[in-house]
Amino acid sequence: MLKLLLPQHRTSVYLFKFQFFNFRFLSQSPSLSNSASSFSSSSLAEAILKCRSAEEAFKLFETSSRSRVSKSNDLQSFSAVIHVLTGAHKYTLARCLIKSLIERLKRHSEPSNMSHRLFNALEDIQSPKFSIGVFSLLIMEFLEMGLFEEALWVSREMKCSPDSKACLSILNGLVRRRRFDSVWVDYQLMISRGLVPDVHIYFVLFQCCFKQGLYSKKEKLLDEMTSLGIKPNVYIYTIYILDLCRDNKMEEAEKMFELMKKHGVLPNLYTYSAMIDGYCKTGNVRQAYGLYKEILVAELLPNVVVFGTLVDGFCKARELVTARSLFVHMVKFGVDPNLYVYNCLIHGHCKSGNMLEAVGLLSEMESLNLSPDVFTYTILINGLCIEDQVAEANRLFQKMKNERIFPSSATYNSLIHGYCKEYNMEQALDLCSEMTASGVEPNIITFSTLIDGYCNVRDIKAAMGLYFEMTIKGIVPDVVTYTALIDAHFKEANMKEALRLYSDMLEAGIHPNDHTFACLVDGFWKEGRLSVAIDFYQENNQQRSCWNHVGFTCLIEGLCQNGYILRASRFFSDMRSCGITPDICSYVSMLKGHLQEKRITDTMMLQCDMIKTGILPNLLVNQLLARFYQANGYVKSACFLTNSSRLKTVSNSC
């Protein structure tokens, strides 16, 4: 491989000499006349090629440059001296001449024509001093000047492969431009012309595989490297591991991680970071923390990326104390928590309902001169609205606007959802208008939230108005939109319109979810169409993922209230066979059915089953059972349940 860099002291001498020559040469008129010269049109190039040394050739070229020869002779003599200098390993001076020639030719022709002229001139040199290395130098100079397409054209036109450094630069340029198919075509072309790939070439190919998602291709490349006796370096192992972690293939990633250590390749911080990120994404935060300890043992300094990944992982695992303790480690290693780290911790506290702690972290950020961004405020506003603290959410909303942080659609949607939960539809609609005035277009989430809000306040007219408005604007309703409207129409005893919307939903290719099925079943039996509800279940019972405990409970409740306790029991059994654990409401529906039919044994067994499942009877359940036991002569059991000290009260009774 050509060594394109000379030692510093030699390079500086050539650069000084060339700059002096270049100034004198370029100061002449760009149009070269046919004035007298000591050489004829082609004799200068011939004389240069006949010189005994590169120094003599360059001196002759420099001296003759004072003469104003023709452009063709200029290009020919340049090509000759570049070949001579390259053959003498004077690469820096050769590249300086190539650069000067490119700049001269660019003034008078398009880059594509210029590259053709220059390539042909260099190729036309007929001499034993012809050096194939000039084309690699030409490629490198084109790349350095930002002329990638010209460099690529030269590499494809060459009769043999450029040197490995030029090939590496070409392939890397294609990867960076995401021209992945060209990477493999050009690589095969280079191989066919004599390129012997090295570990650096393979690293670029691994990068291409990673960005294309070609996992099987990486395995073939690794086998190819092994067959050529090329040892993968830490960067190749890291990108391999990174790809496995991205696809959640942690077992394979672990094997590769151990394999690299077995082969004497020490993981670097990026390798550890990839593994830690993979473990955190799959919820294995303990393994991730174990690798963090390995980093310390290996005497590597963890950076903010490693800490951010760990904080995010522990927050998602609801281990907020551990996540917070990592801040102490960050201080120890001189790593300043960044915005991402704080946003992760704030999000963790919001998901756990610790809004006081989350808002306190905002104040802590500001005390450290770390300005919150739109994500920080959106996380907090969403958390506050979930916890029904809409007034505090609005205060933060006004604060972020005062700080010139522009709310996103997610910010507006969170606050709109908060107002809808409070049934404050006027404020929600005003906020939607403000959203539009601010240049933020309402999206599917905005419309679905507003439609659901109006459905909850029984304003079906306003809900349908928004439904038509969103379709006019080209926003396609989703399953949430349709489910809210279907449920609302059933509650308004308008089954015909509910079924029309369900039909529209299916025609639009939108698959119903578990809430949709629950609304339909609930609507059918409450409209006195229990048989339709059962038929609907039987038609759709293959879609197990679309049935949850709510849908089954609605069906069970309908059957029990209509005296079909045996069929209800079968559905209760079906629910469990689907892997769905009954909740308190499911048990209440079944208990009411058994009590209504005075099925004492079944009632007792169901009560035991409920306790065995880990569901504590609430006040309603205890009262129902107490009255039933008392009416059937089980006084002790009734007294036990009515004893206030033994009542297990739950706020949400069914």
Swiss-Prot record:
Q: Which residues form a coiled coil?
A: none
Query: Mind listing the UniProt keywords for this protein, alphabetically?
Result: Repeat
Keyword Amino-acid biosynthesis attached: no
Concerning InterPro entries, the annotation shows:
Pentatricopeptide_rpt, TPR-like_helical_dom_sf
Repeats (PPR): which ranges?
Answer: 37-71, 74-104, 131-161, 163-197, 198-232, 233-267, 268-302, 303-337, 338-372, 373-407, 408-442, 443-477, 478-512, 513-543, 548-582, 583-617
Pfam families with a match to the protein in the record = PPR_1, PPR_2
Q: Which family does it belong to?
A: Belongs to the PPR family. P subfamily.
Protein's name according to its UniProt entry? Pentatricopeptide repeat-containing protein At5g61400
Q: Which organism is it from?
A: Arabidopsis thaliana
